[in-house]
Amino acid sequence: MKAEYLIYQDSNNRTRDEGDATMKAHVLPLALSLVGMILFYLIYTGHRFQPNKSGRHESYRALVFKGLATLCAAALGAYGAWLSPTPPHMLLAAGLVICTAADVILGIDFMIGMAVFGLGHVAYSLSYVLASPPGIPSLIGFLALSAFVLLGVVPWLRKYRAGKPVAPFAAYAMVLAVMLALAIPQKPVLLAGAFLFVASDAMLAGRVIAHVQGKVYSRICLLLYYLAQYLIAASTLAG
């Protein structure tokens, strides 16, 4: 019994040491991605809230920095997919690249940008299905989120977009509902990223549709988005 216990302890110690070594190996790319995102986020917000001669809300220069911040997360996801080239990881990396493009497009044409983001969520959703097939928790989550979209989001859209199309926004909300429901059985870091993405988009809807104003509000919305993308990318390095 003592010998078996010692073998068990030795096995646990080796597993823990291997896990620690793996995390240490990833500290540098994780840190570089995070620092890069913070830096470009700060530069972008500095440009974002400055008036520009074109009359647009965002200058093209500001959009470059906005995209670069997301690109830092995409690079981290690509690194994780390179280390572990599984279909789920490769789809996450693809989704991050798509979202990087969507980030820039959103500032030029909101509707097209929203559609491209939808494609990014499709890539995320496919990754989740391959990584951990949906079960009862995902089904319950989807039904609850769908009910919220139909009974809460759609009436809200009709109120603030009187006389204007609500279908594109409702469809995007359903895509988010599917993505978040499929994230329920995934790694905690991935679920957290999916949740923060939805929270950020909810705040963005408040700003774009209900015209909620304020620099702090906009900065928190964007910060949640970048944190979401960072966590999704970091999940490719999680055990």
Residue spans of the language-model regions?
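Polytopic alpha-helical membrane-helix bundles and their juxtamembrane interface segments
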Residues: 23-239
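Short, Lys/Arg-enriched N-terminal segments with co-localized hydrophobic residues
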Residues: 9-22
